Amino acid sequence: MTTVPPTRDTAAIRIWLSIVAGLIALMVLVGGATRLTESGLSIVEWKPVTGTLPPLSEQAWSDAFEAYKTIPQYRQMNAGMTLHEFKTIFWWEWAHRLLGRVIGMVYLLPFLWFLWRGAVSGPLGRRLWLIFGLGALQGAVGWWMVASGLTERTEVAPVRLATHLSLALLIFASIVWTLRRLKPRDEAEVPGRLRLTAWALVGVTFVQLYLGALVAGLRAGLVYNTWPEIDGGLIPAAANLWAHAPWWINLFENHLTVQFMHRMTAYTLLALAAWHAFDVMRAGAGRDAVRGAHRLLAAILVQAVLGIATLLMVVPISLALLHQGTALIVLTFAVLQAERLSPRRVAAVAVPQAAVAAGQAG
C-alpha cells in the first residue's frame, strides 16, 4: 500500500471535491443547453458581482432586452422576438453564469478552510492551487468566448467555445484524478504499455471532446446526417475536405472536415479502448484494472451509439445533452483508469504523524 489510512480531513476533502465535480458536470450540461438553445449571447455584459441577480422589475427586463437588441444576433436571427421569448433564453445564460459563481464559492471557501487547518500541502496542495487558478482563468475565457459574438458574429466563435469547454473538462478531470489519488489502493505492477494506452485514451478523449465542441459551435451536426457514409461516401472527397484556404482553416471552420474528424476520432477511441481492454486481461493486470477497462469500453460504445443517433435525428436537444453527459462519463472512466495504472510514490494528503504510525503498524 502506498498511501496512509484515510483521516477525517481526507474524507472531508473527498466529499468537498466530489460536490465540486458534480457541480462542474451540471454546469457543462447547462452550458450545452445554453448553446443548443442559442441563449449564450442573451446577456451582453459581464458583471461578476452585480450580475448575480436577474432583472427584478419590468423596467430592468426591458433594459436587458434593449441591450440584447444592439447585437447582430438579434438583428439577423431574432428580429421580432418578444420579451417573453427573450426571458426564455436569458434564464439559460443567467443560470450558466450563476453556476459558475456558485462553483467558485463552493471551491474557494472550503479550500481556505483546509489551508487554515494545514490539511493540504505538498503535491495535493499544489494540485488544488492549480485547479483554483484554472477556475479563475475559466471565468475570463468564458467572457472572451461571449465577447466574440457581440460585434460582427451572430454566435460565439466555435474555437473559443471549444476552448471554454476544454478548460472546464480539464478542471473536471483534474478533480477526478485528485479524488482517485485520495483513495488508498494497492500498488499494481503492470507493464508500461498498459499505462501508455491508458494515457493515450485520456488524450484521445480530450481531442474528441474538443472536436465535439467544434461540431456544436459550427452547428455541423445539422448537416451530413447520414451514417456510415458522409458526403456520399465513407471518406469525403479531398476537394471538399480542404475547400477553404489556407488549408488549416478547414480544421476549425469547415463543417465537413470537422464532422469527419469527429467521426474518425470516435472510431480511433473505440478501437483503442477495445485493444486496451483485451491487453489488460492478457497481461493479468488485476481485477480492478480489468473492470475499469471494461467500464470505459462500454461507456465509449454507448457514447458512439448516442452520437450516431443524434446525427441521424438531426440533433434533438434532449439527445444531444445525453450525448454530452455521456462524454463526461467517458472522460471520468478514462482518467480513473489512467490513475489506477499509474504508480504512487508519495502520500497524496498531509496527515498527522500519528496516522502515519498507525498505518505502518497495521
Swiss-Prot record:
Cofactor(s) needed: heme b
Domain of life: Bacteria
Keyword Transmembrane: yes
GO CC terms, sorted: plasma membrane
One BP term from GO: heme A biosynthetic process
InterPro entries membership: COX15/CtaA_fam, HemeA_Synthase_type2
Catalysis: reaction(s): Fe(II)-heme o + 2 A + H2O = Fe(II)-heme a + 2 AH2
EC number: 1.17.99.9
Topology relative to the membrane: Multi-pass membrane protein
Top EC group: oxidoreductase
Pathway per the UniProt entry: Porphyrin-containing compound metabolism; heme A biosynthesis; heme A from heme O: step 1/1
UniProt GO MF annotations: metal ion binding; oxidoreductase activity, acting on NAD(P)H, heme protein as acceptor
UniProt function note: Catalyzes the conversion of heme O to heme A by two successive hydroxylations of the methyl group at C8. The first hydroxylation forms heme I, the second hydroxylation results in an unstable dihydroxymethyl group, which spontaneously dehydrates, resulting in the formyl group of heme A.
Oligomeric form and interacting partners: Interacts with CtaB.
Protein name: Heme A synthase
UniProt source species: Bradyrhizobium sp. (strain ORS 278)
